[in-house]
Amino acid sequence: ALGFIPHVENDGYICYTEDNIVLNPKLPKEILEDTMLQVLETLKKGQNKINDKDFVEEFEDYWFRNQVKHDTNIISSFKPTDEVQLIRKAKIGGKIIIDFDDNSIIESAIRFNISRRPKPLFRNCIYIPLEKPLLPPKYSEFWGSSEFKSKIYDNISKGNKEKLNEILEKYHNIKKEELIIISQPKSSGISLYGVI
């Protein structure tokens, strides 16, 4: 077994090319040959850890596949910052919407046709920007609570640690299923994902 490598999904499916390709049905032999070469190249790069950076670039996909059992849709219109902060969330029409304030959440619910007249229950959630990207957890070995906390806490600036500690001290009785939104850098911007 090759272990957990980029582009190999938990069901064994191998993604070796972009989604937007056009195949010439008049060349089936060439398509199969090229497919096999690309699959072997993908596996070789993964085994030799040459394409581990792809875990970071496609972090959200691996995160989603690993946590599909929770099936929570999160919609966000807020622009992530470099500071730990409390933001707002509400569950509307089976989706969780996050933003900086309640009015922005209502606007998002209307704009995305989730609800015309939402009357949600608003709650705080914590936004945490990481300094360096994490690699996703293996499909069969999702992080436990203490491991996840350690990965986050060890990967934020000193100022953000202080801010996070202030928030946690103030809200020390946060319920079990509170939402934490994490951002982490990648070459084309950031990845944004949530943890309940």
Placement of each model-derived feature along the sequence:
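N-terminal ligand-binding/catalytic initiation module
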Residues: A1-I196
